[in-house]
Regions:
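Residue-level detector of conserved catalytic or cofactor/ligand-binding positions
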Residues: 267-275
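Short, solvent-exposed coil/turn linker segments
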Residues: 75-77, 182-183, 272
Length: 275
């Protein structure tokens, strides 16, 4: 209501108007409403962000031809620590609790760049301009995590695998002590490979089923080899004058990459790979 009684707080009907008349979980209609001129949510929000349960399948290809999935990171599951057994679950939980949110090196940037760009200083390169470009985000101290080094291929991932195995088996962990600093040039231009997750399945005409080829080493190496390059084109660090910083340390890709992945999946459904 307009006006109001002095000393009293009135209620502005925002969410109730938004959802009234909408079918429960009718997300299509909800998004249509939010994007329409009828919506008043823009009066109270800086930006409207949409998130999807889609995570780009990103791989690192080493010089010897071997491939490693770095997003979503498969390190723990590949070592048998992601199974349902109580022992492995306990180990995984312990690792996750110790590392916090840092188990995910890659993440999506907010679609609205105005939300974060002013908070950061570009130390090298630039912000992503294409879906297949990403940026290395440093901490306010100008650091990256050791975990990120393994994902980027700047340290041998076998070293990480060994440490996790030792930890899981309650052995003394051989922790490396030879960490060094890295120049911006060593991070700039690092490349990863984008794989359409749907392409890890092929359709078997004989049995009429989709078969996973994720465990087929040769198939996956070829699939990754043919994947699009994802390239680090910039390095950013929180500006010392910023009162807050939205992004976390890691490798951030644009929202347009998520949209690209969804479109690729739809194409695969209409034109399946047959075997």
């Amino acid at each position: 209501t307009s006006g109001g009684v002095e000393g009293m707080v009135s209620v502005r009907q925002l969410i109730t108007k938004m959802v009234s008349g909408l079918t429960s979980n009718d997300l299509t209609s909800l998004k249509k409403y939010l994007d329409s001129d009828e919506s008043t949510i823009a009066d109270d929000a800086t930006s409207i962000e949409y998130s999807y349960s889609v995570s780009p399948q990103i791989y690192r290809q080493d010089p010897d031809g071997s491939v490693h999935q770095v997003n979503p990171d498969s390190t723990l599951s590949m070592l048998g620590l992601g199974s349902s057994g109580s022992g492995s679950t306990s180990v995984t939980s312990s690792l996750m609790n110790s590392m916090g949110s840092n188990t995910s090196v890659f993440y999506q940037l907010p679609a609205n760049s105005d939300l974060y760009k002013s908070q950061y200083e570009v130390k090298a390169g630039r912000w992503p301009e294409k879906p297949t470009e990403c940026v290395a985000v440093l901490s306010k101290y100008g650091t990256v995590t050791d975990y990120a080094l393994y994902s980027m291929g700047l340290r041998d991932s076998a070293e990480l695998d060994k440490m996790i195995q030792q930890f899981a088996q309650n052995q003394n962990v051989d922790v490396p002590s030879d960490f060094r600093t890295y120049s911006y040039d060593e991070l700039m231009g690092l490349k990863f490979k984008l794989v359409n997750s749907a392409d890890t399945y092929v359709y078997d005409d004989t049995y009429g089923i989709w078969k996973s080829k994720a465990d087929d080493k040769d198939y996956m190496q070829q699939l990754v080899e043919n994947g699009e390059d994802i390239t680090i084109v910039g390095i950013v660090q929180p500006d010392y004058t910023a009162s807050a910083s939205m992004l976390t340390s890691g490798i951030a890709y644009p929202a347009s990459l998520t949209e690209k992945v969804m479109k690729l999946s739809l194409i695969h459904i209409s034109e399946p790979t047959r075997h």
